[in-house]
Amino acid sequence: MYLTLQEWNARQRRPRSLETVRRWVRECRIFPPPVKDGREYLFHESAVKVDLNRPVTGGLLKRIRNGKKAKS
């Protein structure tokens, strides 16, 4: 099921201004990304904001960076 930008924002724990949410969409901070339908964005009901400032520290990424010594 898809929600409009206003409906998706209203369901968030801390709703933000519509312009802020539109900026997040342009900066690809929403996953899965919303679909633009005419003049409005449609969000999947399970879409979430992704924090791009948080470093990605997965096990595979550590092994790629450090080689076999990081595998545990």
Curated annotation (Swiss-Prot):
Molecular function via GO: DNA binding; identical protein binding
Subunit record text: Interacts (via C-terminus) with the integrase (via N-terminus). Part of the excision complex made of the integrase tetramer, IHF, Fis and Xis.
Keywords: DNA recombination, DNA-binding, Viral genome excision
DNA-binding is among the record's keywords: yes
InterPro entries hit by this protein: DNA-bd_dom_put_sf, Excisionase-like, Excisionase-like_sf
Gene: xis
Task performed by this protein: Part of the excision complex necessary for the excision of prophage from the host genome by site-specific recombination at the att site.
Key word Translocase present: no
A Pfam family hit: Exc
Domain of life, source organism: Viruses
BP term (GO), one: provirus excision
Name of protein: Excisionase
